[in-house]
């Protein structure tokens, strides 16, 4: 069969490879001039920067894409586990190194507060149990009809998840120490959600880091995008770049998707899998006479969106890779207040920031004697933060100064401004324009209870035959391992349909 995949982000690349490995003719259409989507790369002034995700969690999910296609993952990506997850800075002279080794982890916890290990381990155990339930009964399945969700098994297993509790409530139930609470709560920002609003299940990220480890891909995270692109090439997939999709064509008589309009041409296909940002697709790519019924264009703005980010890619003329960790977090003095600012639409003058120094793990990513630094500051998305003008150069200059002051929390960066030889910024406006991310959201639709599982945009269209959706704004959600799972379960359903002649 001829299959079209819209979008060459990590979801689209993974999905296309899985389909092609089953013997089908696959074409990927990508609007930009390179693959990867938000897993993007910037090469500038001799530096190589990952532009989007940077932390490799759940490596087995990465490997599975290749092995499911009958290939050896080691021929495409080089993975290695990190001994330390990150350094966390509460202040200039208050730093904690978070290890993966259990004995070292216990030492770290006891150094923060004697006796805290028991509560921390109880938290991890609770979350692990919830994760296993969620993975088996909710995350790794699709919901094609109401009875797939509304049944006794889902009711019983869902009750065990206690989804009415929020992430911060679960953390505070087990952890009294404020520093340790911060260590656990900030990671909900990895998928753009407010720990006060996100279901307690979304506190799984620290558990995944501790129990499955954190890894690094040689060449940076973009090495995964390159590996997937090579996998597709080896499987005979055709990738068309600079291919802007103008419309998904729906046959009104048979109510099926049978073509796409790309760069002015109508291209016929047997099935279409769309991995572009779902809200933008529902708003702009469906014909007027054939909207996605639950998500018509006029309702898209009313959905809840994850936060955005202000990113800086900085090159400095000194090598500091032996004085800093690969992954670092610098906390705001008022962490809770900063969370409120992000999700209430205000800019922070004392943000929590994430700092990634890739040359710590791979010297090839910076010129000899120099260092590349990636900084992420969570910000409101464009709807909540409608009063923020990201095109205002005075404003972006002010934000850069805030970030440089915050970076000075790390001793080696105290004089960073005098060493800068390269600087690039990426704003919420850029998320919207580059990736068609609605409201510049960095992680798609926010996974609130009302936008999760059965209530999230589904992988198999309920309105039109031969149309499928995958990616961060669809089930099961955002984050690289999760969108890879989205690709898998969507392709599984497509293959079942093909085998049944549907």
Curated annotation (Swiss-Prot):
Documented EC number(s): 1.3.8.-
Catalysed transformations (reactions): 15-cis-4,4'-diapophytoene + 3 FAD + 3 H(+) = all-trans-4,4'-diaponeurosporene + 3 FADH2
Statement: the UniProt record of this protein carries the keyword Heme: no
pH dependence: Optimum pH is 6.5.
Keyword Oxidoreductase: yes
Record-annotated membrane-spanning stretches: none
Similarity-based family: Belongs to the carotenoid/retinoid oxidoreductase family. CrtN subfamily.
Further comment: Reacts with dehydrosqualene and not with squalene as substrate, however it can utilize zeta-carotene and phytoene to a certain extent.
Free-text function comment from the UniProt entry: Involved in the biosynthesis of the yellow-orange carotenoid staphyloxanthin, which plays a role in the virulence via its protective function against oxidative stress. Catalyzes three successive dehydrogenation reactions that lead to the introduction of three double bonds into 4,4'-diapophytoene (dehydrosqualene), with 4,4'-diapophytofluene and 4,4'-diapo-zeta-carotene as intermediates, and 4,4'-diaponeurosporene (the major deep-yellow pigment in staphylococci strains) as the end product.
Protein's recorded name: 4,4'-diapophytoene desaturase (4,4'-diaponeurosporene-forming)
Record organism: Staphylococcus aureus (strain Newman)
Taxonomic classification: Bacteria, Bacillati, Bacillota, Bacilli, Bacillales
